[in-house]
Amino acid sequence: MSQEIAVIGSPDFTTGFRLAGVRKFENVPDEAKDDELDEAVTRTLEDEDVGIIVMHEDDLDHLSRNARQSVERSIEPTLVTLGGSGGASGLRDQIKRAIGIDLMDE
């Protein structure tokens, strides 16, 4: 069984992924993120067909503490965030969380 990529975010954020063929997405308008983002993340985490969740880094600030901890600690599906100011260190942390070791450790 192959696992799919799911994208969660504003329609502006998800559109490019949908055009690229990503079939699973949750559109949450910017003005509704504080109310609806937790539910969208929970639904996606519970979807057994999803292997990777893509979100914008800034959207994590709209999640409740419990939802944020759930998505950040999830191994499968794995969270990948884009944008924001995390840069290479954010990617390093995501890789370390996903596989359990720091590949860039010197």
Swiss-Prot record:
GO terms for biological process: proton motive force-driven plasma membrane ATP synthesis. It is found in: Cell membrane. The keyword Phosphoprotein does not apply. Its main location: membrane. One of its GO terms (molecular function) is proton-transporting ATPase activity, rotational mechanism. Gene3D superfamilies: ATPase, V1 complex, subunit F. Keywords: ATP synthesis, Cell membrane, Hydrogen ion transport, Ion transport, Membrane, Transport. It is a peripheral membrane protein. The keyword Cell membrane applies. GO terms for cellular component: plasma membrane. It holds the Pfam family ATP-synt_F. It comes from the Archaea. Component of the A-type ATP synthase that produces ATP from ADP in the presence of a proton gradient across the membrane. Belongs to the V-ATPase F subunit family. Has multiple subunits with at least A(3), B(3), C, D, E, F, H, I and proteolipid K(x). This is A-type ATP synthase subunit F. It comes from Haloferax volcanii (strain ATCC 29605 / DSM 3757 / JCM 8879 / NBRC 14742 / NCIMB 2012 / VKM B-1768 / DS2). The lineage of its organism: Archaea, Methanobacteriati, Methanobacteriota, Stenosarchaea group, Halobacteria.
